[in-house]
C-alpha cells in the first residue's frame, strides 16, 4: 500500500477516473502463476490502464497481465530493489519453474527517492547487490566479445557501466536510507533496465553471476522458510563470478592450447 494512496489522490486531482484499486490479499505475494491468473481476471473485467504501485513482484505481475489483456501500463516504483522496472519481460514461476515471459516494458515509470529510501533496508540491499553484479557482468560481456560470441553494444554497455562507481560509492548510506544515495542506486538500476530494453536482451546487465540465481530458482532455494530475493542470489553469484575472474587473470592463458 506504500504510495498507493498518493497515486490515487494525484490521479483524482487531475480528474482521471479510476477503478477500485486491486490489492493482493496474500501477505506472501510472489511472482507466481496463481497471482497472474488473479490479476488477469481483474484486468479482463475493465478497460482501465493498469498502474502498478510497488516493486519487483508487483511490476512483473502487472507487466505480464497487461500484455495478456492487450494494453500497456505504467509503474510507480516504491523500492530500489532490482533493475526490471524499465526492461521488457517478466520473471514468473509457473509449474514450479521460474520463467521469463516476453512482454513490453511500461510506457511510463515514476520513482520517488524519498519513498524508496524509506523502504526496508533489505530491499535496497537487494538492489545494491543486483547493481554491483553489473561489474562482473560487464567483464563477461567483454570476454564474450573478444572470443566472437556476443558483440559489444557500446551504447548499452556505457549506459550500465558509466555511473556504477558513483551509484555504488556508499553502501552504508544506502543501508541507512540516505535519500541521495538511494536515488543514485535507483538511477543505476533504471539505466540497466533501459540498456536491456535498448538491446532487447539481458546481456548488458547480467552475466555468469545471474546463472547462480537461475539455478537456485529452479531448486526453489529458501532461507528460513522464505524465498530469497533475486538481488541476494545474484550477490552470492557475484562473489563466485569475481573469484573465477581473478583465477582467470592469474592463469597463464598464453600457454593454453
Predicted feature locations:
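ATP/NTP phosphate-donor binding region
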Residues: 1-49
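Active-site segments that bind and position negatively charged phosphate/pyrophosphate groups
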Residues: 159-257
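Short glycine-/acidic-enriched loop or helix-start segments at secondary-structure transitions
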Residues: 4-6, 61-63, 85-86, 120
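General beta-strand structural signal in soluble alpha/beta enzymes
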Residues: 20-23, 51-53, 74-76, 110-111, ...
